[in-house]
Amino acid sequence: MQLNAHEISDLIKKQIEGFDFTAEARTEGSVVSVSDGIVRIHGLGDVQFGEMIEFSNNTFGMALNLEQDSVGAVILGDYLHILEGDIVKCTNRLVEVPVGEAMLGRVVNPLGKAIDGKGDIDAQGVRPLEVMAPGVIDRKSVDQPIQTGIKAIDAMVPVGRGQRELIIGDRQTGKTAVAIDAIINQRDSGIRCVYVAIGQKDSSVATVVRKLEEYGALANTIIVVAGAAVSPALQYIAPYAGCAMAEYFRDRGEDVLIVYDDLTKQAWAYREVSLLLKRPPGREAYPGDVFYLHSRLLERASRVNADYVEKMTNGKVKGQTGSLTALPIIETQGGDVSAFVPTNVISITDGQIFLETDLFNAGIRPAINVGLSVSRVGGAAQTNIIKKLGGGIRLDLAQYRELVAFAQFSSDLDVETKAQIDRGQRVTELMKQNQYSPLSIAEMATLLFSANSGLLDDIEVNKIVDFEVSLIAYMKVNQVSLMNRINEIGNYNDKISNELQVAIDDFKTNYTW
């Protein structure tokens, strides 16, 4: 069939008449639906993943689902005033948080806005919520310790600067207490701290803030709060916000400690957001990228070399390394560490401190299970004197737990086995520690030396705690020079050993407890 010229011109005219001349808005869109903090938007063709988008009334959201004909976004704040048909605009900026020295001592929400009633924060700048972790070439090995002040951790599960050490256990086993004690111990160390509270009761966070202020650690700490009452979207971004604030100090050649309390609740929030965005669920209804959720966060904790710091500060800081040490917390259900999220985070981190309900209920606090707790890189960073004195302690406790289990089936024990059990009972008592009472290196070394040298063997088990308190008080008053030397140098040698032996013998001979 042939078309003549007249028919062809008619066809072309029809095509031209039916052509839609309206231009597609690439940086603007309109709300199609809004529910449960999730918005479906038509338009926004140029939006990036993770970009901050602006609604009316100065409300912001974050684009998370980029589909062929729509965008799925979460609203970071109140969404009750957002209606179908409202205009949404791109900002060409990823979600950012304020950073800087001005943030220290303040309580903020995940967007960096003050919620402590002390007025606005005049921040030094802003950083994107998510950035790439430092590469292999930018990193330095972990070889400097971070003292938590907790005997059981510093002696047996040491943490180094730049390490990721997981704190894991059931609810009400003292996970937050361990992390808060570690923060309190940094008040005079120059190490900055960030505490991220995710999905917690406001009353619990208020208690933490009050305790940090009481013990003089708040001025050195940023507290990021996404409480149980805020939207899942804010709980999801809270750890990344805290990490961005901490990285500001790391990239200037400083040392930072960050606590994520806890990442289980962040995973729950992310699962909720993902299901509302209609992403396909996987194991335990978590989305497929829940491993990446935590790995990309925890990989940002690192020790960086001087070249990286110089590059990040444009040459202003030279010859200085920086570090970001992470203490993520994971809550288990019924002691099940083989669940989905716990196994993920265990595989990402450089070791774990496992807290046990049975030990906690037995009065052994912190309730650290020495057999299941490990630090994969902290040994290289441990203070010399604690490393040399602490090795024997771990062995004593391990043998004690084994022998106690064996002794249940046998009433007739030889003298050597009974002596080992007696030693283990005393070491177990010695490892107990009250909350909010971190110890210095010298105080810890004194107690570890007394256990290692058999100086506790003639003291009744129920008197060990009284002996410990009195011995520390005696050393602070009568052995000031020795204690200062141990704190400053941190090395262990025959001279230190002899001086400690003489001092403790003198205390046992001339003092009571």
Curated annotation (Swiss-Prot):
Site features described as Required for activity, chain residue numbers: S373
Catalysed conversion reaction: ATP + H2O + 4 H(+)(in) = ADP + phosphate + 5 H(+)(out)
Topology versus the membrane: Peripheral membrane protein
Binding site for ATP: G169, D170, R171, Q172, T173, G174, K175, T176
Superkingdom: Bacteria
Membrane spanning residue stretches: none
Protein name per its UniProtKB record: ATP synthase subunit alpha
Organism the protein comes from: Vesicomyosocius okutanii subsp. Calyptogena okutanii (strain HA)
Encoding gene (name): atpA
